[in-house]
Amino acid sequence: MKLEDAVFITDCEGPISKNDNAFELASRFIPNGERFFTLVSRYDDIQADIIKRPGYKPGDTLKLILPFLRAYGATNEKMRSYSSQNILLVPGAKETLKFVQKIMPSFIVSTSYEHYIESLCDLIGFPKENVYCTRVDMDKYDLSEYEIKRLKEIRKEISGMPMPEIPKDAATFEALPDETQRVVKRLDEIFWNEILQMDAGKMLREVNPVGGFEKANAVKEIVKRTGSDLSNVIYFGDSITDVDPFRLIREGGGLTVSFNGNQYAVREAEIAVMSHSTIIISILADIFRKIGKEGTLHLAEDWSTSSLKGICDPSLLMKLQTLLRDKTPRVERINPGNISRLIRESSNFRKTVRGEAIGRLG
């Protein structure tokens, strides 16, 4: 790989920010919104990872909750205002994005709504034309009084449902607990029969969240735009929405990094990072550009600050050395022998960085 061919792509929520904006919007606008969102998110995980519903992709939670956000008064302006006032960056994120933009074409590919992503771009000075995210115009959808009333009744029913359980070894719908199967069947009726027939159903038909295969499509478009190749891409992700781009890039010879990832991310990535700071993103991007995928993987097998000397930008190493000992990033190459441990450790670490409620989400 030539230095000038490297391309940097990252998810937003996780590697760059601590937010789960959709979860937070649900909590802000919808009564008992935290539980409501968590339940719909579990349903999303089951649809995407176990049932593999045709046309369904990880992150479609973001369209499923839209009718309810609208019924409870969410507008473009309210979503933009709330999002801009509640951005929580991972320490170092602004500096990392400035650094990577200097050394290679850099992009954000996020499932998040445009209201949040555009607010974040304004805050950190990232070019909006280098962002792929979920486009939605809330003000376009007018709901009748009857639909608003009915959606509020449905919200109450969903919030009162038992939380779906997903056993670790569940690979089929039949392997799910009976109670979870009943919840999933009822949610199928609600979303794909009742709501789809409402005016609010237009949101489910028209909004296309950038998760799963849509993130992979964004990666393909970025490679085309930059005239590069998948083997020149380094991608940072943290959740189920990154599984498809991870697979695409890995199979194309690029490098995939789980940053404080959950089980879905660690399962598909080649390097696992656990860090309170984005400095490690800057370092991995820098060394990937200089010594390529195999060289970076080799360093990750026996990671140490001393092994980075002579390769990594000295200013990055100085910043790394100023971190407190207990804040030093952990970097490991994922292999069959350590993957179970890394899934456990990364999932737990994720909760300490992003909070228990957000950390548990798929």
What does each model-found stretch correspond to?
Residues 1-150, 209, 272, 276, ...:
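Alpha-helical substrate-recognition element adjacent to the catalytic core
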